[in-house]
């Protein structure tokens, strides 16, 4: 629902399905695909991963525009041969800075920024330490070297949450307060305290660019097709 809310004026024909309920053979008829976040860890194995791999095979065959968000970012990179681990730093949560690479700054449908550094909403503990084969790094920070990646012209993945709003992130920080206190005996890597992480939450229009630009790309490709 958050993705739909972020894109309410850009797209109105959505289908939301669990991976195990998607038939790979119909992927060619999709205008675009978004692999969302999930409360799961890809340091473990799941029965649906083989189906997800078949889905990605079809996405590549038909060059379907695809966006991976957080867990989706990790899933796509993993299925292309990348490696996912639990970060030794604990959770990265709150408003964080990411640095765009030259490829990220010049990418046509990633984020509209020529400053090199942007603030985004983050909430995750697992990270990509080796990207998928042929994936290009678009953004990084000291917590995760692969904050965003790209595969050819039609797949983009982001570790952060472009669908989040200010109230959503505050809820996640408060929900994980006890866990964060146990993980971060020293000050958080990106803020001086957990309460400061909540105070730092603000509206971040540029954080949503990765989602908005993806939908615009799907629309453009759909019209040209």
Model-derived regions: residue spans:
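Cysteine-nucleophile active-site neighborhood
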Residues: 36-104
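C-terminal and late-domain segments of enzyme folds
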Residues: 140, 144-225
